[in-house]
Amino acid sequence: VHLTADEKAAVTGLWGKVNVDEVGGEALGRLLVVYPWTQRFFDSFGDLSAASAVMGNPKVKAHGKKVLNSFSDGLKNLDNLKGTYAKLSELHCDKLHVDPENFRLLGNVLVCVLARHFGKEFTPQVQAAYQKVVSGVATALAHKYH
C-alpha cells in the first residue's frame, strides 16, 4: 500500500487510540449482522440468531480482537502486506474456504466503526487513508486465491 507521509501519520496516529478489544468485536459483530451470510463461517460461535445475540457474543468479541491484532501487524508492515498475510491468506483460502469478498466487506465495516468511535477526528482525509489500508489488507488476504 502506498501512503503519503501524512496518510501514514494519520493512520498510525489514530490507530494508537483504538481500543482493539472494543472495536474488533464491534467490527466483526457488525459484519455478521449487516452481511448475515458471513455467519456460515462461524458455526462454532453459538447463538448468532439476532443482532443483540451477535453483538453480545463473547466468541465474536474474542475473534474480533484477534482480527484487529492481525490488522495491527499489517499497519507495521504496510510495504509487505502480502508477506505479512501470506499464512492467513492460505488458511482462509485452503482450509476455511472464505469468500475473499468478505475481507473487503470487513474492511469497510471497520472504517464505519472507526468513524463511529472517533467522530470529527475521523476526517475525510483519515477515512481516505484507512480505505487505502483496508483495501490493501483485503487484497493481501485474497492473494492466495489467485
From Swiss-Prot:
Residues recorded as bearing N-acetylvaline in the entry: 1
S-S pairs: none
Binding positions (heme b): 63, 92
Cited Pfam families: Globin (PF00042)
GO biological processes: hydrogen peroxide catabolic process
UniProt GO MF annotations: haptoglobin binding; heme binding; hemoglobin alpha binding; metal ion binding; organic acid binding; oxygen binding; oxygen carrier activity; peroxidase activity
Tissue-wise expression: Red blood cells.
Keyword annotations: Acetylation, Heme, Iron, Metal-binding, Oxygen transport, Phosphoprotein, S-nitrosylation, Transport
Modified residues (Phosphoserine): 44
Protein's UniProt keywords contain Iron: yes
GO cellular component entries: blood microparticle; haptoglobin-hemoglobin complex; hemoglobin complex
Modified residues (S-nitrosocysteine): 93
InterPro entries xrefs: Globin (IPR000971), Globin-like_sf (IPR009050), Globin/Proto (IPR012292), Hemoglobin_b (IPR002337), Hemoglobin_oxygen_transport (IPR050056)
Residues recorded with modification N6-acetyllysine: 59, 82, 144
Gene3D superfamilies: Globins
Modified residues (Phosphothreonine): 12
Domain Globin: 2-146
Record family assignment: Belongs to the globin family.
Function: Involved in oxygen transport from the lung to the various peripheral tissues.
Oligomeric and partner information: Heterotetramer of two alpha chains and two beta chains.
Protein name as catalogued: Hemoglobin subunit beta
Taxonomic lineage from the root: Eukaryota, Metazoa, Chordata, Craniata, Vertebrata
